[in-house]
Swiss-Prot record:
Has three domains with a flexible linker between the domains II and III and assumes an 'L' shape. Domain III is highly mobile and contacts RuvB. The keyword Acyltransferase does not apply. CDD domains: UBA_RuvA_C. Residues 65-143 are annotated as: Domain II. Homotetramer. Forms an RuvA(8)-RuvB(12)-Holliday junction (HJ) complex. HJ DNA is sandwiched between 2 RuvA tetramers; dsDNA enters through RuvA and exits via RuvB. An RuvB hexamer assembles on each DNA strand where it exits the tetramer. Each RuvB hexamer is contacted by two RuvA subunits (via domain III) on 2 adjacent RuvB subunits; this complex drives branch migration. In the full resolvosome a probable DNA-RuvA(4)-RuvB(12)-RuvC(2) complex forms which resolves the HJ. This is Holliday junction branch migration complex subunit RuvA. It holds the Pfam family HHH_5. GO terms for biological process: DNA recombination; DNA repair.
Length: 214
C-alpha cells in the first residue's frame, strides 16, 4: 500500500497532479480544496495517499493532510460510496464540518457535495455516526490515567470532573490533528459555555464549532 509520496511536482491539472518520486511519475487525483496548497512545478510536495485497486485499474488519491485522508478512508467504508464521491466530499466539506454534520444529523450539509443526494447523506450519517464518536473520543479515554478515574464509591480521585473532561477534550482534538496552540485557544474560548453535566460529545461539538468559525 502506498500511503505517502514525497517528490518533485511535475504537472498540475484541475483534477490531478503528477509527482516524480524515486524515478517514477505518479498520477495522483486530489480534492478541489487542495489546489491552493499544491506547489508549482519544480517544487517539492509531500502527499498523504490512498491507493484504490480494482480489476481494471489502480488509482492514487492524494491529500495535503492526514486528517483529509482519514475522512476519505472513513467515507469509503459507507456502502454505495466510491472513491470519486469520497474525494468530492473531502474537496467540498472540511474535516471539522464533516464531523459536525455527522454528529448533528445535518443532511443538508452533506447534500452540498456533488453526487450525494438525501438518501446517500442519511446513509453516511447512519453508518458513520458511531465511528465518528469513536474517532473523536477513543484516544482521549485511553489516555486517562488511573488517578483520574472514579473509585467504587463514586468519589473523584486527584482531579475534578471538569478538569478531567477538559483533558479528555484536548486529547480528542489532538487525535483529530489539531495543534496544541489551536487546542489551548479553543478550550480557553469555550470554558464559559461549559455547564455541569455536559458529556464529552457535547464538549466536542462546542470545540469543533469554535474551530470551524475561525
Amino acid at each position: 500500500m502506498i500511503t505517502r509520496i514525497r517528490g518533485e511536482m511535475l504537472e498540475i491539472t484541475p483534477d490531478y497532479c503528477v509527482v516524480m518520486a524515486g524515478g517514477l511519475g505518479y498520477k495522483i487525483y486530489i480534492p478541489d480544496n487542495c489546489q491552493e496548497e499544491i506547489p508549482d512545478p519544480g517544487q517539492e510536495i509531500d502527499l498523504h495517499t490512498y491507493l484504490s485497486v480494482r480489476e481494471d485499474a489502480m488509482t492514487l488519491y492524494g491529500f495535503t493532510s492526514g486528517e483529509q485522508l482519514a475522512v476519505f478512508e472513513l467515507i469509503m467504508n459507507v456502502s454505495g460510496i466510491g472513491p470519486k464521491i469520497a474525494l468530492a466530499l473531502v474537496g467540498t466539506i472540511p474535516p471539522t464540518e464533516f464531523y459536525l454534520s455527522v454528529l448533528n444529523d445535518q443532511v443538508n450539509q452533506l447534500t452540498k457535495v456533488p453526487g450525494i443526494g438525501k438518501k446517500s447523506a442519511q446513509r453516511i450519517i447512519l453508518e458513520l455516526k458511531e465511528k465518528v464518536k469513536d474517532i473523536t473520543s477513543k484516544d482521549a479515554y485511553q489516555d486517562i490515567s488511573a488517578s483520574e478515574k472514579l473509585d467504587n464509591t463514586g468519589e473523584k480521585l486527584g482531579i475534578s470532573t471538569r478538569h478531567k473532561h477538559l483533558d479528555e477534550l484536548k486529547a480528542a482534538l489532538s487525535s483529530l490533528g489539531y495543534t496544541n496552540r489551536e487546542i489551548e485557544k479553543t478550550v480557553d474560548a469555550i470554558q464559559g459555555q461549559i455547564t455541569e453535566g455536559q458529556d464529552m460529545e457535547e464538549l466536542l461539538r462546542l470545540a469543533l464549532q469554535k474551530l470551524n468559525t475561525k
